[in-house]
Amino acid sequence: MGTASSLVSPAGGEVIEDTYGAGGGEACEIPVEVKPKARLLRNSFRRGAGAAAGAGPGSLPRGVGAGGLLGASFKSTGSSVPELEYAAAEYERLRKEYEIFRVSKNQELLSMGRREAKLDTENKRLRAELQALQKTYQKILREKESALEAKYQAMERAATFEHDRDKVKRQFKIFRETKENEIQDLLRAKRELESKLQRLQAQGIQVFDPGESDSDDNCTDVTAAGTQCEYWTGGALGSEPSIGSMIQLQQSFRGPEFAHSSIDVEGPFANVNRDDWDIAVASLLQVTPLFSHSLWSNTVRCYLIYTDETQPEMDLFLKDYSPKLKRMCETMGYFFHAVYFPIDVENQYLTVRKWEIEKSSLVILFIHLTLPSLLLEDCEEAFLKNPEGKPRLIFHRLEDGKVSSDSVQQLIDQVSNLNKTSKAKIIDHSGDPAEGVYKTYICVEKIIKQDILGFENTDLETKDLGSEDSIPEEDDFGDVLWDIHDEQEQMETFQQASNSAHELGFEKYYQRLNDLVAAPAPIPPLLVSGGPGSGKSLLLSKWIQLQQKNSPNTLILSHFVGRPMSTSSESSLIIKRLTLKLMQHSWSVSALTLDPAKLLEEFPRWLEKLSARHQGSIIIVIDSIDQVQQVEKHMKWLIDPLPVNVRVIVSVNVETCPPAWRLWPTLHLDPLSPKDAKSIIIAECHSVDIKLSKEQEKKLERHCRSATTCNALYVTLFGKMIARAGRAGNLDKILHQCFQCQDTLSLYRLVLHSIRESMANDVDKELMKQILCLVNVSHNGVSESELMELYPEMSWTFLTSLIHSLYKMCLLTYGCGLLRFQHLQAWETVRLEYLEGPTVTSSYRQKLINYFTLQLSQDRVTWRSADELPWLFQQQGSKQKLHDCLLNLFVSQNLYKRGHFAELLSYWQFVGKDKSAMATEYFDSLKQYEKNCEGEDNMSCLADLYETLGRFLKDLGLLSQAIVPLQRSLEIRETALDPDHPRVAQSLHQLASVYVQWKKFGNAEQLYKQALEISENAYGADHPYTARELEALATLYQKQNKYEQAEHFRKKSFKIHQKAIKKKGNLYGFALLRRRALQLEELTLGKDTPDNARTLNELGVLYYLQNNLETADQFLKRSLEMRERVLGPDHPDCAQSLNNLAALCNEKKQYDKAEELYERALDIRRRALAPDHPSLAYTVKHLAILYKKMGKLDKAVPLYELAVEIRQKSFGPKHPSVATALVNLAVLYSQMKKHVEALPLYERALKIYEDSLGRMHPRVGETLKNLAVLSYEGGDFEKAAELYKRAMEIKEAETSLLGGKAPSRHSSSGDTFSLKTAHSPNVFLQQGQR
């Protein structure tokens, strides 16, 4: 084991000698061997290795030969004691470390074991929870499926219930209306029997008197509102009518005070006053005869005539002033055309020139010294043959030392002599031509504004439509947004539809339509069906004219749908227009939603509301309703039962009629008979002096035998084609070609080829094609001025000649100043002939897009660009360009302000934006626009844009977002204008309306009061704008159930409406009516005829409604003088004029004159009319009121007694009207302190009221109150108290029945208010019966 000297055992002991030599004989201790510790051995190894390394390469460690490991690990026996101690200490240290290590590891193992056990427990718990969650999930999933199943079943049950509910609702409505109709029939029969009994009694025949029986046949609990009566209140006798019952539903009595309007008594304008403006406007628009196209067109056509001498003046006018006039008319929504022809040496354009003169609004003649004979005929046509009295102007350039020719002087003399009856002005000018042309421009501008457009002020060019000085038209009647262009389009369409040179045998159809109107309700709509071009529009328009003539009390609402996808076929615009028509006939105009869905809900309600109040029938006529997109969805109200007095007539093509409608009663238009077809064609030929040969007539008879060749439009077109060929001299050829055409489309193609071949060159042919294509691809048509700008090389001569040819051949027509196709077949023919393929159509649309885009870039945003450009982008599928166009704030503003809300929404939906995105886009665009705004005008325009955005968002239902732009508009107006400016009041009103809709009534009340204060300061306390704020406050308080405050403000509003000068109607038509008045005025300047006298009377009524009393007085006097000359001084029509003049004098407080006129009218009517005639009763009534007003009570007594007699003869002794007359007479006696005479009259009236109206009727209460006052003044205080107590009980009962909203009546204070008769009772104008 090596050569170590000794190993010492720790236990001590034995000495072992070394027997192997080297040291010899040296004793040592032999240690006891133990197993070395691993750590010790490792340390020993390290030390051994370190020692060997330290010895160097040339030496070996000691004992290496005997084994390196042991020699390196153990010291020799000769080691020192400190080393041993060190090893022992090291050993001890290692042992302790080991023990510590062992213990720590054991603890770690125990900890890990515990942690493992804990994790196992947690794992088991989580596994259990997971299994529980999986079970819960499965359970919830099953519950969800069962809930969905239950939901679907509930939805099915709800749909079934809704269907059953609607079915029951319709059945109940049918039942109710049937019973109402039966009640009406019974009441009508009762009245007829009463009148028969009275006639028999008058003849001396003894009959049974129902008044003597104990039955209650003459009593009913149902009555109408608005019964007029005079009452005596607290010592001061009132003479105003009472409100009557506002809680009754059905009318059962007839009498002057039971009429809902004065029109019900004596026809249109029989007894109209200024507060009946809405009804007056509607009636005048409806019953006045139709006039020429130029009156209603929104195009100002200026026809220029010039000579070689005045060519410089005309060129200067066209260059410098025609664009200004065009811009002025464009700003007001009108077109301006300055049409002129070159000097026509060969007279080849004579027919076209005459046509242009006939269409023109204004003719200007530039003349110097001579007048060529070629122009003489045009001048005579324009200036001397001017039956409609259109404005005319002559610019006569004078020159020193030179005398005009005889022809010039003769023309000027003739025009000067006619100047009293024609609107011809002559400008004589010498000097600078430019100065003379400027004078002409000033005169033309004035003529356009005053005479043609009917505006009163002459400075409209200084006012922008968005300026702060011009309140937008829609604000004149609240929030209703009316598009005058849509209304003009309908008027012109109706005119064109009713124009027919030949009768088509419609009499049998007229009778069927009349039977529908007279048929008992309920009745579904009548379907007028027929093939394309069968004459449906002509039939309906002719029948409407007959109804207006024969039944003036019938309210007719009509709408003529144009081609598909045009504005007239927009369902929301149709419903909105018809709703506004219904609102026009209501007593007040409330806010109208523009949301299409809500419009569909509100229209039937307005229809039912008006039908309950209107005395006559209401007829709704919609032509070509099948052209409306998704017509069944948007016209759902047609399938519901209609009110009793409402009838609906719709026309459809046979092929496109919705299947569900085929079950309705149908009037089918058959093709013309061969005989009628032949007669129409021959008559068309005779109109141009062309006669067909016998052989040609036989061929014609053989040709017109099929349904397509006997179609009304085909026959008309055939006749026009032959007449045109006869004038051109190629009759045989064209007749042969016409025989080859077996339907309308092929015949239209022949017409196109014929007109195209008549063009002079290929350039003209191409222009014709392009014009027709542009009209075809446009939204609503193209104007002539737009065509002239699109094709600058084109002359007016070519354009007017082409349009004349296309118009005569039933291809094109005018509508709202635009060229459009007369018939759908013409539109279809052009599409098939010239627009094959989408690429061609797209190219023409792009041409229009470029034109209108250029307009926008020039800041020319007109109603035309707003109508066409977005629609064209939509048709092209250009979403980004449409998006950019909609963000042009003025385009969107134009669409919204004209009520095209649904159209605007459809564009945004096409772009892919929802409501919130729309709002954000507009806000961002407005903010960007605001950064560039400078100056007061721009800030005012910005405020208008913010206001429009607010109103738009309100209509979208985004009320919280609508507040922000309206508040911003208010801030801008307060800063840019003045805090007390009227436009600030407008902003406050709009902001308040949002808060009302948002149910934040406190905010709304504060804003309305601020607007009221500003309006009162700006306009005065009696202005309609002030009344609007009062009405808004009344509505607000009513929503909060504050009925007393609501009644207070509503009374103030109605009083203002009574006194206000109503220069405009509630909805539309003032400018049109003014132009019509001017036209009527000119038409009455001819011979003395009864019709002209009636027209003068109408004009007097119209000017009276406009508060132009002096002008009204002139026309009424002229009417009276003409009637006295034509009819004689004792004719009833003269009494009508006298009555109207008396009412006018009464209005002017000229009571003496009014008394004389009333007395003359009464004398005539007493001799000419029956004792119970309504006209006699009205004259008696108003003369009696006048006597009372003048204090001539003695004269009034016999008239009031006569009124009692008349009503007894008319309605029987127990009719409420008789009681009203008795009360009026009793009031008069009370004023004269003849209480003894008054008492029995009151008691008799009370008995009639109780028997006929019931003991708790308000009339009974008012009569009791009058009796109480009479007893009080007679000293019978106990009886007075008893009567007054009973009167108060009746009033309290009515108040509780109305939910606290008792109508205002006469009280002891003498305060009077009546909703139905809120008008001054002494102001009535009459008009001739129709």
From Swiss-Prot:
Q: Which UniProt keywords apply?
A: Cell projection, Ciliopathy, Cilium, Coiled coil, Disease variant, Lipoprotein, Meckel syndrome, Myristate, Nephronophthisis, Repeat, TPR repeat, Wnt signaling pathway
Positions of N-myristoyl glycine lipidation: 2
Region annotation Disordered: where it falls in the sequence: 1296-1330
**Which tissues does it occur in?**
Widely expressed at low level. Expressed in heart, placenta, liver, skeletal muscle, kidney and pancreas. Expressed at very low level in brain and lung.
GO CC terms, sorted: ciliary base; ciliary inversin compartment; cilium; cytosol; extracellular region
Q: Which InterPro entries match?
A: NPHP3-like_N (IPR056884), NPHP3_ab_dom (IPR056886), NPHP3_hel (IPR056883), P-loop_NTPase (IPR027417), TPR-like_helical_dom_sf (IPR011990), TPR_NPHP3 (IPR056885), TPR_rpt (IPR019734)
Report the locations given in the UniProt record. Answer: Cell projection, Cilium
A Pfam family for this UniProt protein? TPR_7
Record's subunit section: Interacts with NPHP1 and INVS/NPHP2. Interacts (when myristoylated) with UNC119 and UNC119B; interaction is required for localization to cilium. Interacts with CEP164. Component of a complex containing at least ANKS6, INVS, NEK8 and NPHP3. ANKS6 may organize complex assembly by linking INVS and NPHP3 to NEK8 and INVS may target the complex to the proximal ciliary axoneme.
Disease per UniProt entry: Nephronophthisis 3: An autosomal recessive disorder resulting in end-stage renal disease. It is characterized by polyuria, polydipsia, anemia. Onset of terminal renal failure occurr significantly later (median age, 19 years) than in juvenile nephronophthisis. Renal pathology is characterized by alterations of tubular basement membranes, tubular atrophy and dilation, sclerosing tubulointerstitial nephropathy, and renal cyst development predominantly at the corticomedullary junction. Renal-hepatic-pancreatic dysplasia 1: A disease characterized by cystic malformations of the kidneys, liver, and pancreas. The pathological findings consist of multicystic dysplastic kidneys, dilated and dysgenetic bile ducts, a dysplastic pancreas with dilated ducts, cysts, fibrosis and inflammatory infiltrates.
Protein name, as recorded: Nephrocystin-3
Supply the source organism for this entry. Answer: Homo sapiens
Q: Which gene encodes it?
A: NPHP3
